[in-house]
Amino acid sequence: MNSWNLSSSIPIIHTPHDHPPTSEGTPDQPNNNRKDDKLHKKRGDSDEDLSPIWHCVVSGGIGGKIGDSAMHSLDTVKTRQQGAPNVKKYRNMISAYRTIWLEEGVRRGLYGGYMAAMLGSFPSAAIFFGTYEYTKRTMIEDWQINDTITHLSAGFLGDFISSFVYVPSEVLKTRLQLQGRFNNPFFQSGYNYSNLRNAIKTVIKEEGFRSLFFGYKATLARDLPFSALQFAFYEKFRQLAFKIEQKDGRDGELSIPNEILTGACAGGLAGIITTPMDVVKTRVQTQQPPSQSNKSYSVTHPHVTNGRPAALSNSISLSLRTVYQSEGVLGFFSGVGPRFVWTSVQSSIMLLLYQMTLRGLSNAFPTD
């Protein structure tokens, strides 16, 4: 098999002419493989057995973690832009990246909150892909549900189930990203945690355990439609890419360049569409309790202004109204540049590695 091709458990829908009829499984000669053959052709798996669910779980966890790691610094820039829209030095994506790098460094600046992100990255991605694949197979094979509805529903359900794992890490990550380095002399975020452990202890002690799920509804309002759209787009783009490759005389599996392109387009498009809810989610999860609004958080520079917007609430509708009243329509697209880059590149990395790991596991643990 050409090293530029990948096997996949993600379906590519073939036309009836993609696979020539065989003498096995005809109406006159039924056999036990007929049902499986029909399902494989509907799903477009190139007549290869579908990967076991545990392959999808492991592959998804690896792809998600590496993708998140690679793009964390850009996610930090997006968080600063959304959490501090009034700070001029963070308004431009490139200059914001450079400013954070020069002022705060890589580890505590651009990669602030990295350990918090990794706390939920692998398990949540593993749960998502396992749920997504199981739901998709059940809906298509057992219930004969329309493909587009299936992909939207599977992405929606996968993200909902994994949210119980990633939301607490998202709260901690976002606050640490907004804070930057400890005793930050360059930006007063409203938080000053010395490390991840201190952040967990402080949040639970001062705000209660439930605060780790603060903004849960806002997070779901962003992530459920994002995942549903991302994978519906991804499945459709892969089908189109496969048809194009078929016209060029290639059949069976999608080439790596097209795997990268389809993943990037799916993630980037879904990212742009869901940016308004990403803004609300960031504001909700990083707002300060009223009792701490006048508290100085920078020991070395206690009078540095934070440029933070007014506190919102846990209400999505009120948060949307507050953003609109204070910043207008453009406020809903604060950080859209880095979010587009992040979601497109992260999606391409994650989904490419997902496919590659699936192939490796299939070779190491064949199902035949």
Swiss-Prot record:
GO terms for molecular function: magnesium ion transmembrane transporter activity. The keyword Nucleus does not apply. Belongs to the mitochondrial carrier (TC 2.A.29) family. Disruption phenotype: Significantly increases steady-state mitochondrial magnesium concentration. Rescues the group II RNA splicing defect in the MRS2 and LPE10 deletion mutants. Solcar repeats lie at residues 51-138, 146-240, 254-360. This is Mitochondrial magnesium exporter 1. It is a multi-pass membrane protein. Its main location: mitochondrion. The gene is MME1. It is found in: Mitochondrion inner membrane. InterPro entries: Mit_carrier, Mitochondrial_sb/sol_carrier, Mt_carrier_dom_sf. GO terms for biological process: magnesium ion export from mitochondrion; magnesium ion transport. The keyword Lipid metabolism does not apply. The chain crosses the membrane at residues 56-77, 115-135, 149-165, 219-239, 260-280, 332-353. Keywords: Membrane, Mitochondrion, Mitochondrion inner membrane, Repeat, Transmembrane, Transmembrane helix, Transport. The lineage of its organism: Eukaryota, Fungi, Dikarya, Ascomycota, Saccharomycotina. Residues 1-48 are annotated as: Disordered. GO terms for cellular component: mitochondrial inner membrane. Present with 2060 molecules/cell in log phase SD medium. Pfam families: Mito_carr. Transporter of the mitochondrial inner membrane that exports magnesium and thus, plays a key role in mitochondrial Mg(2+) homeostasis.
